[in-house]
């Protein structure tokens, strides 16, 4: 049965307008994004099929162009639309820490870092640069790929910190696996960065690992 023949309060779009987006299931939200189904399937049916194929909403949102576009009902145009939506969401959440804002809430800082890094399908290493009053100067993604001692260069981190005239910074990187537990490599590169930055009187306040949850090196006593 076409969605247009469903009772009004069961149609995803009408349900969202009357009850809010939080009332919708993952399949219903995805169906609104898809707009149409395929032969023999409504948009909701197709959404359920895609969620099953990818293993849930998050893996679908993290899929690369090739795997995303190979699924029936999707393609490069939908992939581009999805990336635009995700980036708008990241930017919206990022506004919680604008330039000049002081870091008064660890929770706000972590939400910001999660918004920026959580959904990347590859590892990204970033720095949040702060002034001597712990106000935000800039956020930069510096390295992509496998985060280890060979790919994160302390000299470049120091160079960018000095360019921003930063007095302190927060390191962050994501684990695409969703497991936020720091590795020994994470601990080693954190020590190298801390020591390199200390030579120019710049403090490392924390290193946050972003996965399905967040791990703070400062809270663990790993700094």
Swiss-Prot record:
InterPro entries: MPN, RadC_JAB, RuvA_2-like, UPF0758, UPF0758_CS, UPF0758_N. A motif (JAMM motif) lies at residues 173-186. It holds the Pfam family UPF0758_N. The keyword Ubl conjugation does not apply. It comes from the Bacteria. Zn(2+) binds at residues 173, 175, 186. Disulfide bonds: none annotated. Gene3D superfamilies: Cytidine Deaminase, domain 2 (3.40.140.10). One of its GO terms (biological process) is proteolysis. GO terms for molecular function: metal ion binding; metallopeptidase activity. Residues 102-223 form the MPN domain. Keywords: Hydrolase, Metal-binding, Metalloprotease, Protease, Zinc. Belongs to the UPF0758 family. This is UPF0758 protein Tgr7_0100. It comes from Thioalkalivibrio sulfidiphilus (strain HL-EbGR7).
């Amino acid at each position: 049965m076409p969605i247009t023949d469903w009772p009004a309060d069961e149609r995803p779009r009408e349900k969202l307008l009357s009850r809010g987006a939080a009332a919708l299931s993952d399949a219903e939200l995805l169906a609104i994004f898809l707009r149409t189904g395929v032969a023999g399937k409504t948009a909701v049916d197709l959404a359920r099929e895609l969620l099953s194929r990818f293993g849930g909403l998050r893996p679908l949102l993290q899929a690369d162009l090739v795997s995303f576009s190979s699924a029936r009902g999707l393609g490069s145009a939908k992939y581009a639309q999805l990336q635009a939506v995700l980036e708008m969401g990241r930017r919206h959440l990022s506004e919680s820490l604008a330039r000049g804002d002081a870091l008064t809430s660890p929770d706000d800082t972590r939400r910001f870092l999660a918004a920026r890094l959580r959904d990347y399908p590859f590892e990204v290493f970033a720095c949040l640069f702060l002034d001597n009053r712990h106000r935000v100067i800039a956020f930069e993604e510096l390295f992509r790929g496998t985060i280890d001692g060979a790919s994160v260069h302390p000299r470049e981190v120091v160079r960018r910190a000095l360019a921003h005239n930063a007095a302190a910074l927060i390191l962050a990187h994501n684990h695409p696996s969703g497991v936020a537990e720091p590795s020994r490599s994470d601990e080693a590169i954190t020590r190298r960065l801390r020591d390199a930055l200390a030579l120019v009187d710049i403090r490392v306040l924390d290193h946050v690992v972003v996965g399905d949850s967040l791990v703070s090196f400062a809270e663990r006593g790993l700094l």
